[in-house]
Amino acid sequence: MKRRSVLLSGVALSGTALANDSIFFSPLKYLGAEQQRSIDASRSLLDNLIPPSLPQYDNLAGKLARRAVLTSKKLVYVWTENFGNVKGVPMARSVPLGELPNVDWLLKTAGVIVELIVNFVASLPASAAAQFERIATGLSGDLEAARQVHEALLEEAKNDPAAAGSLLLRFTELQTRVIAILTRVGLLVDDILKSASNLVTQRGQGDGLNRFRAVFGTLRLPEVADSFRDDEAFAYWRVAGPNPLLIRRVDALPANFPLGEEQFRRVMGADDSLLEAAASRRLYLLDYAELGKLAPSGAVDKLLTGTGFAYAPIALFALGKDRARLLPVAIQCGQDPATHPMFVRPAESESDLYWGWQMAKTVVQVAEENYHEMFVHLAQTHLVSEAFCLATQRTLAPSHPLHVLLAPHFEGTLFINEGAARILLPSAGFIDVMFAAPIQDTQATAGGNRLGFDFYRGMLPESLKARNVDDPLALPDYPYRDDGLLVWNAIRQWAADYVAVYYASDGDVTADVELAAWVGEVIGSGKVAGFRPITGRSQLVEVLTMVIFTASAQHAAVNFPQPSMMTYAPAICAMSAAPAPDSPSGKSEADWLKMMPPTLVALEKVNIYHLLGSVYHGRLGDYRQTGFPYAPVFSDRRVTASGGPLERFQARLKEVEATIRTRNQARRRPYEYLLPSRIPASTNI
């Protein structure tokens, strides 16, 4: 009975945990948060009368006021390294009221949760679905009506800014209405848990892959469901998928990957060779050794999902001599060649090798999801931004120009990170169910990756150089690199223009005591590896570029592929239900299907990844306050004047958008995750 109950709680739409966790559904908290935002907005109106300034140029009264504000902030924004499920990682001890999400975010997120409820209900037997369909339809209608009221209030405030104050009462009524809808969402999930538990275990009992397709009731089955076994598509994941950060060019193969010349030529043709491919910069490698305990190799038994496996494979890819497309060459399913044989991509005529090859690719995809979710997504975006958010609030006064610039890039970050720690990472939580490794090892390994992430080496240009993939002549088709650099450079120019407004010289940088305190907190309390004192304007620009890019574009690139690329379990999953293949030949489709995860894992993947990848809140370049009526953040005419830094940044983003859309017309598959119009300003989901 316990297993069945937890099974349904896993099914219940990632909204189950949300609905039953007070951090998401606490009316008093949200009302208090809006009151706090109103207070902050009032302060902002006063602050707007005086342009932001560096502390060294403030008068005595101003310096005392700054010190008082920061003293109070430090009582609210408190560091801890003992937050549950992410111990050792610097986090906020609790989420301050002003950091809770606003009505706009709640409406968007609630809409996605209801969409997931409808999807789940649609795949229940008709007799059980009827009552839930009626309630879910009503919730959808109420949410749409609330959205329309929200849009109408914003339009009124836009047309008559002076009336914004008088609209606050109606906005408060809307907020109460939205909270009531969220409460009903929670009740509906509870009802599903109570009434449908005996039906859930009957779901997805079709043959082959049918059970994985069955979890898409009303949600559109992603295109990857029909293409994931294709070798070219498998290779394209490395340059345009959710984890485009691991592939690197190599001049020679590692000693523990003994692919022979004859094997290479079987794949790439008799007129090619390993030596020639290496010399002409056409060899590319994935090595998942860094997974460590995320890849236990042996069987791991869990109550809810049975036996699971994950490995640390090595995979070789190569370009043909025409450099037209990247293709997989060979896979070794673990680090030791003595225990893991080499799998070489078979020709169409080698049918006896087909399913062994598919099994080896599944091993790679299991490693890929582990690496993506725990490292490049959670550790290197969410948890890195957490440190900069706390340091900014604790050391930069609200009147500091860098606080004004950076705060919008941290909207929602503390809140969503606490949610991740509480809901995704506990024992029997989403990650424990979906991933093979014991949850304690998963938590520790993800935390270790965050603490080991080097800030300067992680900068996009440096990361590309370190992996030898920065040259488009060597690797022509790398959408993440090409589009990412466009966005990086636009942000860098914006940071340079902004810094020039307030810092006249390098001396202004070194004389800024609040900036020095910020650096000290990032290094000391934030434990950001590689971070160091900032001694000049050019270095400050690079630092700001990295902070903003990480919170916005980098998170977008690794988060928003999830619904289209990661919800279909056979395409990618963080555990397999059977061990890696022991031989390239003699395998069947039945052997490959045994590697597919339990239906529970497939259900949880749909729910959590669709939710995380479907909420777009805020937009890069659109700097607005979090409280109604979401007024502009910047008031300094040196920043906002026509033709000034902000307008130039927004114009550059439009140019980047146009360039990417033009590129997508020529690409085999559009790469849309770094379109500026689809990049939220902060890591808020």
From Swiss-Prot:
Main location: periplasm
Lipoxygenase domain boundaries: 122-685
InterPro entries associated with the record: LipOase (IPR000907), LipOase_C (IPR013819), LipOase_C_sf (IPR036226), LipOase_CS (IPR020834), LipOase_Fe_BS (IPR020833)
Binding site for Fe cation: 377, 382, 555, 559, 685
Designated name of the protein: Lipoxygenase LoxA
One Pfam family per UniProt: Lipoxygenase
Pathway annotation: Lipid metabolism; fatty acid metabolism
CC cofactor: Fe cation
Statement: the UniProt record of this protein carries the keyword NADP: no
Upper lineage: Bacteria, Pseudomonadati, Pseudomonadota, Gammaproteobacteria, Pseudomonadales
Record field: catalytic activity: (8Z,11Z,14Z)-eicosatrienoate + O2 = (15S)-hydroperoxy-(8Z,11Z,13E)-eicosatrienoate; (4Z,7Z,10Z,13Z,16Z,19Z)-docosahexaenoate + O2 = (17S)-hydroperoxy-(4Z,7Z,10Z,13Z,15E,19Z)-docosahexaenoate; (5Z,8Z,11Z,14Z)-eicosatetraenoate + O2 = (15S)-hydroperoxy-(5Z,8Z,11Z,13E)-eicosatetraenoate; (9Z,12Z)-octadecadienoate + O2 = (13S)-hydroperoxy-(9Z,11E)-octadecadienoate
Enzyme Commission identifier(s): 1.13.11.-, 1.13.11.33
Residues of the signal peptide: 1-19
Biological process terms in GO annotation: fatty acid metabolic process; lipid oxidation
CC annotations in GO: extracellular region; periplasmic space
